[in-house]
């Protein structure tokens, strides 16, 4: 695609997929770290990154506990199929909770008030159980919030042509724990490293990158390894 000038649509979330931070990261212990790592993973790629509503806040799956809370017809039908296959109620709800399209269809979490500030009426579907902590108002003026991190990503993409127009080379394709790639345009080079696991992994640096400048990361300091869901962007 790159060789012929192709252009990708880059996204984790949409109205038919579970929330990325719950699906590919951690929506508990490493919620912030994994949400920011997933953002870096695609926002430094070649193409157009999409931000689905609430993704910039780290919105999670809603953690529904009853089938009565779901509205998605596929989820309701799949519930019946799983129960007919003698899956227990607990196991069935666990499967639905991980896969349902309703995971990304709950109202936008605006603030900590009733119905997450989305409406004074009755929403057609329930609100995620963590809306009092995860909402736009809580992050609006917080410099260390996920929302602020997204603003930094957008600003860097506008400022640095290598991100929007440079070439991309993926590295270490056999390492399932790591997403790594290089961006370059003849003037600037970037190295993007993303730990996809909830554990520490090795931090491989190609030749010539040991003394590179740290452009961005989701941990305040620098380590010789990649910590759980850590992302690092180096520049030279």
Regions found by a protein language model. Give the residues of each.
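Active-site and adjacent substrate-binding regions of carbohydrate-active enzymes
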Residues: 1-209, 213-236
């Amino acid at each position: 695609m790159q060789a012929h000038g192709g252009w990708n649509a880059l996204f984790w979330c949409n109205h038919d997929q579970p929330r990325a931070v719950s699906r590919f990261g951690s929506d508990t212990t490493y919620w912030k770290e994994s949400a920011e790592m997933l953002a870096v993973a695609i926002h430094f790629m070649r193409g157009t990154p999409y931000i689905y509503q609430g993704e910039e806040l780290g919105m999670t799956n809603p953690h529904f506990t009853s089938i009565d809370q779901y509205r998605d017809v596929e989820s309701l039908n799949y519930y019946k199929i799983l129960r007919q296959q003698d899956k227990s109620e607990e196991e069935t709800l666990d499967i639905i909770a991980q896969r349902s399209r309703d995971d990304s269809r709950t109202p936008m979490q605006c603030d900590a008030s009733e119905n997450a500030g989305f409406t004074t009426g009755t929403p057609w579907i329930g609100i995620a159980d963590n809306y009092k902590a995860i909402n736009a108002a809580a992050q609006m003026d917080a410099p260390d919030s996920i929302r602020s991190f997204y603003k930094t990503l957008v600003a860097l993409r506008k400022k640095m042509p290598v991100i929007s127009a440079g070439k991309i080379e993926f590295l270490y394709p056999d390492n399932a724990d790591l997403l790594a790639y290089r961006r370059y345009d003849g003037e600037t080079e970037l190295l993007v490293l993303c730990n996809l696991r909830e554990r520490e992994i090795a931090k491989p640096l190609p030749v010539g990158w040991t003394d590179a400048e740290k452009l961005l990361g989701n941990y305040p300091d620098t380590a010789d390894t990649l910590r759980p869901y850590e992302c690092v962007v180096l520049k030279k």
